[in-house]
UniProtKB/Swiss-Prot annotation:
Cofactor(s) required for function per UniProt: Mg(2+)
Organism: Saccharolobus islandicus (strain M.14.25 / Kamchatka #1)
UniProt-recorded name of the protein: Anthranilate phosphoribosyltransferase
Family that this chain belongs to: Belongs to the anthranilate phosphoribosyltransferase family.
UniProt binding sites for 5-phospho-alpha-D-ribose 1-diphosphate: 79, 82-83, 87, 89-92, 106-114, 118
Binding site for Mg(2+) 1: 91, 224
Keyword Transferase assigned: yes
Manner of cofactor binding, per the entry note: Binds 2 magnesium ions per monomer.
Swiss-Prot/TrEMBL keywords: Amino-acid biosynthesis, Aromatic amino acid biosynthesis, Glycosyltransferase, Magnesium, Metal-binding, Transferase, Tryptophan biosynthesis
Length: 345
């Protein structure tokens, strides 16, 4: 593969084929391409607009080069991030609820644009985020939950970390996280930072052997189910791609004030989650339940979103014990108790 020819093709706004993109991504991730050319390629892709084939090719490369574990029938609740609003880590909270009834392989990272990434909030709760593969399988067996820290499970990505940081712009790598779960989770609730990317990412997901994925973008511009209004969805399954629009009031609840969901730090997010689990923060609890409801539908545990919401109400009642179990087997209960004390006021 001639990297300069690939660059010229991208500059001329021609899309790469899947095999070309996969080969290119492997070369970049392995550190075989000079940084100046990596920068040029990532910018050219962004300016052209990443195609479905390019996303699929890059995702396949990242999956192949990742440290892998086998978690049958797992669900993930990862999102692209990048919405910039800094809301509570609802996908992580939902993952904890889902682990009451299904294996969860939560793939995530530290915050990039927000105040708290999934790794940050789990650490604040006392969780040990570095989990080797054998230990990960053990934790899933015992608790139905494991966190797969992206930096640990995609070690080759360190070869592009400097370029990405220097560029300081969104690149194709920013949208690959939810598509590259090291456990190859077959079910997913995938938050998308932009409504415009729903179509592209749903078509990409369709090519990547998921059983069922629900991609969501919610008003007022978040990569979650909307707490205030409409959620735009793409439901991807073996049968194809279905487009759905759903309003928060369709759950049978009122809209949730967005300002009640904003956090300033990982600890702040952890406290809000625990308060919701304890029944002390109704707004955050509702936000968790509506996102969990859609994830339950992705798992085919319920027949519609409203039924999912009713199921989520039951799950959140059992969330504190589940959180204690998760931290006790892989973390620091002292840190969790500190958060519990701060949450009890």
């Amino acid at each position: 593969m001639n990297i300069n020819d690939i660059l010229k093709k991208l500059i001329n706004k021609s899309d790469l084929e899947i095999d070309e993109a996969e080969e290119l991504a492997k070369a970049i991730i392995r550190g075989e391409v000079p940084e100046i050319l990596v920068s040029a390629i990532l910018v050219a892709l962004r300016m052209k607009g990443e195609s479905k084939n390019e996303i699929v090719g890059f995702a396949r490369a990242m999956r192949e080069l990742a440290i892998k574990i086998d978690v049958p029938n797992a669900i993930d609740t990862a999102g692209t991030g990048g919405d910039g609003l800094g809301t509570v880590n609802v996908s992580t909270a939902s993952a904890i609820l889902l682990s009451l009834i299904n294996p969860v392989a939560k793939h995530g990272n530290r915050a990039v644009s927000g105040k708290s990434g999934s790794a940050d909030v789990l650490e604040a709760l006392g969780y040990n985020i570095i989990v080797p593969p054998e230990r990960a399988k053990e934790l899933v067996h015992k608790t139905n939950f494991v966190f797969l820290f992206a930096q640990y499970y995609h070690p080759a990505m360190k070869n592009v970390a400097n370029v990405r940081k220097t560029l300081g712009i969104r690149t194709i790598f920013n949208i690959l996280g939810p598509l590259t779960n090291p456990a190859n989770a077959k079910y997913q609730l995938m938050g998308v930072f932009s409504k415009d990317h729903l179509d592209l990412l749903s078509k990409s997901a369709y090519e990547l052997d998921f059983n069922k994925v629900i991609l969501v973008h919610g008003e007022p511009g978040i990569d979650e189910v909307s707490p205030i209004g409409k959620t735009f969805m793409k439901i991807v399954s073996k049968r194809g791609i279905e487009e759905v629009k759903f309003d928060v009031t369709d759950f049978g609840i009122s809209s949730i004030p967005i300002d009640k969901l904003i956090v300033n730090s990982a600890e702040d997010s952890a406290i809000k989650i625990v308060r919701a689990f304890l029944g002390k923060d109704e707004h955050v609890a509702e936000f968790i339940k509506i996102n969990t409801a859609v994830a339950l539908f992705a798992l085919d545990k319920v027949s519609d979103f409203k039924e999912g919401y009713e199921y989520a109400k039951y799950l959140i009642e059992n969330s504190v014990n589940k959180l204690n179990e998760i931290i006790s087997l892989n973390g620091d209960l002292t840190k969790l108790k500190t958060i519990m004390v701060k949450s009890s006021g």
